[in-house]
Amino acid sequence: MRKILARPKEMILLTFILVCILGLFLSEKLYGETYEKVESYSCLIGLSLPEVENPSHGALMEELHSETKNRDINVIMKEAGGDFLQQCKDIKQLASYGVDVMVISPIDSESVREAIKELNMPVIILENPKFFDAGSVYMEYDSVWGGRALSHMILNEHSEGILLLRGSEYDPVSRQREAAFVDSLTKEQKESLTILEVGKNRDEAERAMKYFLISNHDIKAVAGLSAQTLYGAYLAAVKLRNFDMDFYGMDNEMSIKKISDGDFHWIVYSSMAKKILDVGEELYLGKEVEKRIEIGEL
């Protein structure tokens, strides 16, 4: 009786082994190519942004995604929707993922500062002067250079009828560029300058410009502090068939390339995304880096 029962057990075991081998073979055939396409990386960077509705932050995320395609670096991104408590949670969550370097554009809050202090890794702080000393490296666009260069470009062509598009009050980059632009004007030029609040994105800028142009017809030059807000103002002018203005702006190359139509004059910045990845990788490898980095002309 025992020998008779052993044979079915042996057959069951043999069948199980054959099924396993067949399963492995089919898996390789079906999924082998997918596995081969998965790219490994040596450095993992965590990025915490206040909000992506800010044109500069949205552009930075896209730039980073593009730059990492050909590099041995991966970036995990989170945005806080303008909420400082959410940013604190984002920072802690990114740290729990085991990132090697943290990149943070901080919301003005002591809670955020405390969350940064708790990190046990290199930290790159972006574009908030109040947090200059909060991380390993502070990085920002050279707003003084950009603001002055933009004003000089415009004043070479126009002495009056200048409209400056003011961005969100919560955007430190926009505020710094505006201050540099205005500071480079003479007293008379400052008095004749018109400033229009246009919000933080293209749609808000277009709406603000439409209302403005209905009752204002003496503008000759429009100065934008980001590509998207300038483009919004341009669209409003086109829809109202106002073709008597010149449009001047500043931004990085990738943001500018998104605008395919229209005649614009640009101050072009180098890529912050590339610099973030370069510095992040150097910090990960334990190399010495500059404590303050300004992104200037392309």
What are these regions (language model features)?
Residues 2-17:
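N-terminal Sec-pathway targeting helices
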Residues 30-60, 136-137, 161-170:
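Short beta-strand segments enriched in small/hydrophobic residues
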